[in-house]
Amino acid sequence: MITGIQITKANDQALVNSFWLLDDEKAEARCVCANGQYAEDQVVAVSDLGQIEYREVPLEMQPTVRVEGGQHLNVNVLRRETLEDAVKHPEKYPQLTIRVSGYAVRFNSLTPEQQRDVIARTFTESL
């Protein structure tokens, strides 16, 4: 179990008012902040701190989210009619951006053939 502490009394005065995370299972202490000889995130054996008195400091633990493997979802939020109108009236859609092969591109910068291909591949009647 991890316990947060603030050292209130110690043989080594540099430790007074420093903050640590104590790991009871490993008998280690991780420095959160201290003056002097200990660096932030430095890990030492609890016995290296010597004789100390401390007060516990409440900890707020946030669960770690782990994603392995990953998923990808490509969501199209356009209608076929919007892209067809952009082919006919490009001046109405100067900022229309689409994704092609993993990168973003302005629809109007594509050739007419590429635009037709995007429309054909993006909107199908059935799978």
From Swiss-Prot:
One of its GO terms (cellular component) is cytosol. It comes from the Bacteria. Residues 5-127 form the Glycine radical domain. It holds the Pfam family Gly_radical. GO terms for molecular function: formate C-acetyltransferase activity. The modification Glycine radical is found at residue 102. Keywords: Organic radical. InterPro entries: Auton_GlycylRad_Cofactor, Form_AcTrfase_GR_CS, Gly_radical, Glycyl_radical_cofactor_GrcA. Acts as a radical domain for damaged PFL and possibly other radical proteins. HAMAP family: GrcA. This is Autonomous glycyl radical cofactor. The lineage of its organism: Bacteria, Pseudomonadati, Pseudomonadota, Gammaproteobacteria, Enterobacterales. The gene is grcA.
